[in-house]
Regions:
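Short, charged N-terminal beta->alpha structural module
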Residues: 2-26
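Short, hydrophobic beta-strand segments that form beta-sheet elements in well-ordered domains
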Residues: 5-7, 24-34, 158-160, 196
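Electropositive phosphate-/nucleotide-binding environments in soluble metabolic enzymes
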Residues: 9, 77-84, 126-130, 134, ...
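Internal nucleotide-binding/catalytic subdomain
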Residues: 22-24, 28-99, 104-108
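Active-site "cap" helix and flanking loop/linker of ATP-utilizing ligase/carboxylase catalytic domains
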Residues: 84-101, 116-162
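A short beta-strand motif that forms the metal-chelation/ATP-contact edge
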Residues: 108-118
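Peripheral (often C-terminal) accessory segments that flank ATP-dependent C-N-forming ligase machineries
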Residues: 138-219
Length: 219
């Protein structure tokens, strides 16, 4: 049986790993996606053929030096409830199956919907009960979807893309020596993401780590 999942080539490895962890196989439908440059809000919705719908908490998505920065939004509850209703209605009216990311302005105006899993979903690998990637595989096989609730309310995730001429071992050792809480996960030999949870200086710490990995700074 063939199960094709639309995914950005940058994070395709994470789908393959999720499938392997479940003992399943999937066929990838690779794409190259573009995420809006301005800071915005994003909700991932996953709908299985068995009519089960799961949505993830609203994330704030921004860019820093063309890198994607994701963290829990601080938007008010009234707006969050409104966005949830909009997403639920759009999913039902579109007969969507699989994964879709709904993007809105900070004021709640609809921007777009993408059916391709992209880099702005990697946060879920660290801070959701079940990642977007695992639930995408579950949806493809019409299996019950996993829980989407957050494991923590304070975290920040940023992707990296290191020049191929730079080594990775020494930077990894340096970062872990200075901040044991870093999660540095590779998608390929020189791409991946840095994640950190905590209650202070998250952007400064994570952006420092990404700059160090990419050779922008050397200390």
């Amino acid at each position: 049986m063939s199960h094709r999942i639309k995914v950005d080539i940058e994070v395709a490895a994470f789908i393959s790993r999720a499938a392997e962890s479940l003992g399943l196989e999937v066929h990838l439908d690779p794409h190259t996606t573009s995420i809006p440059s301005d800071e915005h809000l994003a909700i991932v919705a996953i709908n299985s053929a068995s009519t089960q719908l799961a949505t993830y908490p609203v994330m704030s998505v921004a860019k820093f030096r063309n890198r994607i920065v994701v963290k829990p939004t601080q938007a008010n509850q009234e707006l969050l409830k409104k966005l949830q209703i909009v997403v639920n209605e759009r999913v039902k009216s579109s007969n969507q199956s699989g994964v879709a990311t709904y993007r809105f302005t900070l004021n709640g105006e609809f921007i777009e919907v993408s059916e391709v899993i992209s880099i702005d979903s990697v946060w879920s690998m660290e801070y959701a009960h079940t990642s977007v990637f695992e639930n995408a595989v579950r949806s493809a096989y019409q299996l019950p979807l996993g829980k989407t609730e957050l494991l923590t309310q304070e975290f920040l995730v940023m992707n990296f893309d290191v020049p191929r001429n730079l080594g990775m071992t020494e930077p990894f050792l340096h970062l872990f020596a200075h901040e044991p809480g870093y999660r540095v996960v590779k998608a390929t030999s020189h791409t991946g993401y840095v994640a950190l949870q905590g209650d202070r200086d998250l952007f400064e710490k994570v952006s420092h780590a990404v700059d160090y990995l990419e050779g922008v700074i050397n200390e």
